[in-house]
Amino acid sequence: MAPPHNYLAVIKVVGIGGGGVNAVNRMIEQGLKGVEFIAINTDAQALLMSDADVKLDVGRDSTRGLGAGADPEVGRXAAEDAKDDIEELLRGADMVFVTAGEGGGTGTGGAPVVASIARKLGALTVGVVTRPFSFEGKRRSNQAENGIQALRESCDTLIVIPNDRLLQMGDAAVSLMDAFRSADEVLLNGVXGITDLITTPGLINVDFADVKGVMSGAGTALMGIGSARGDGRALKAAEIAINSPLLEASMEGAQGVLLSVAGGSDLGLFEINEAASLVQDAAHPEANIIFGTVIDDSLGDEVRVTVIAAGFDSAGPSRKPVVSPSAAQTQPIASARAGKVTTSLFEPTDAVSVPAHTNGATVSVGGDGDGGIADDVVDVPPLMRR
C-alpha cells in the first residue's frame, strides 16, 4: 500500500515590470513563505538585482534589455513573444499572483498576458497591483486605467491599491523613498494576507478550496488588514481592516468574504464573534463568508484580522472620493529611513485609540497631474508585512 501523499497548494507569485519585481523583492525580504517567486522584466539590469527564485528576461530582441520605455504596447509584445517560456514557468501552479505597478510599460502591458496564461492553465489567478501617484502624471494615470481594465478581464480576482491613499496617511516630511516603500508594503500585505490563509494551519482552518470558492471569477476584490491590542482588540482590528484607508472602495455588497482572525492562545470566543459579526454586517446579507482562526502565541496580546471581500455586482464596489492629505486623520508614514514604514503603517493599534466604526472606506483614484515620469523603475508596487 502506497504511503499517503502530503498535498499542498502550489502558489506562485509573478512580479512583472519594475514595480512588480521590486514588490517581489520586498516579499522575499519580509520572509513570505510557502510560495515560489518569479521575476519578469524587459530591463535586464534591474532583473539582475532581483532575489526571485526564477528570473525571465523578456523582449530581448525588441528592447535589447533596456526596458519598455513606459510604453505598454512594448511590454505587451515582449510578454507575448515569451508566452511559451511563461507558460512553462507557471505550469503546475494551483494559484498565481500577478503583481505590478500600473502605469509604466512592462507591468502595464505584460501583466494581462501573464494572467491570461495562468488562467488558461487552470490556476486561480489573482492580480495585486498599484495605481500610480497623481504626481506621476496624467499620461501614466491613463495608462494605468487601461492596464487595470485589461488585467481585470484576464484574471479571476483583481485587487487594486491606490498609491494616492498613502499621501493621506503621511506627513509633509515623508520622503519619496518612504512613499514608494510603503506602497511595496501594501502589495506585500495583499499577497501575504491571502497566502497566509492557505498555508498557515489554523484552529478553524481555511484551505485552498475555500479561497478558490470566494475568488474564482470574482472580478474586483478589496483587501484589508487590521491589528489591535487591549480591550476590544478583535473588534477594533476588524474595524481597521474593513475601513482601511488603503482600500479602493467600500466592501458593502460583497458576495464573498474571506475572514481570518489571528491571535494568541488567549483569543476568546466572544471577541471572535464580535469581529466576525462586524464583518458580516458590512458585507451583503447573503454573502458567502469563509472564516478561519490562527493561534500564534508570538503575537502576544495582539489580534490580527484579515478581510478579503469579492463578488460584487456588475457595478462593482462603490467608489468614494479622495480626501485631501490635510483632511485625512490617519497614522503617519515614517519620514526617516524607509525600513520604518512597516512599523508606522501597520503597527498594531491600541484599541482605545481607534475611532468608531463607520460605513466603508474612502477611495483613492489615480490622478491628473501634468508631468510625466517615463521610467519603469517608478512603478514600485506596495507590499505589506505580516
Curated annotation (Swiss-Prot):
It comes from the Bacteria. The lineage of its organism: Bacteria, Bacillati, Actinomycetota, Actinomycetes, Mycobacteriales. One of its GO terms (cellular component) is cytoplasm. Gene3D superfamilies: Tubulin/FtsZ, C-terminal domain, Tubulin/FtsZ, GTPase domain. InterPro entries: Cell_div_FtsZ (IPR000158), Cell_div_FtsZ_CS (IPR020805), FtsZ/CetZ (IPR045061), FtsZ_C (IPR024757), Tub_FtsZ_C (IPR008280), Tubulin/FtsZ-like_C (IPR037103), Tubulin/FtsZ_2-layer-sand-dom (IPR018316), Tubulin/FtsZ_GTPase_sf (IPR036525). The gene is ftsZ. This is Cell division protein FtsZ. PANTHER family: CELL DIVISION PROTEIN FTSZ-RELATED, MITOCHONDRIAL DIVISION PROTEIN FSZA. GTP binds at residues 18-22, 105-107, 136, 140, 184. Keywords: Cell cycle, Cell division, Cytoplasm, GTP-binding, Nucleotide-binding, Septation. It is found in: Cytoplasm. Essential cell division protein that forms a contractile ring structure (Z ring) at the future cell division site. The regulation of the ring assembly controls the timing and the location of cell division. One of the functions of the FtsZ ring is to recruit other cell division proteins to the septum to produce a new cell wall between the dividing cells. Binds GTP and shows GTPase activity. SMART domains: Tubulin, Tubulin_C. The keyword Cytoplasm applies. One of its GO terms (biological process) is FtsZ-dependent cytokinesis. GO terms for molecular function: GTP binding; GTPase activity. Belongs to the FtsZ family. Homodimer. Polymerizes to form a dynamic ring structure in a strictly GTP-dependent manner. Interacts directly with several other division proteins.
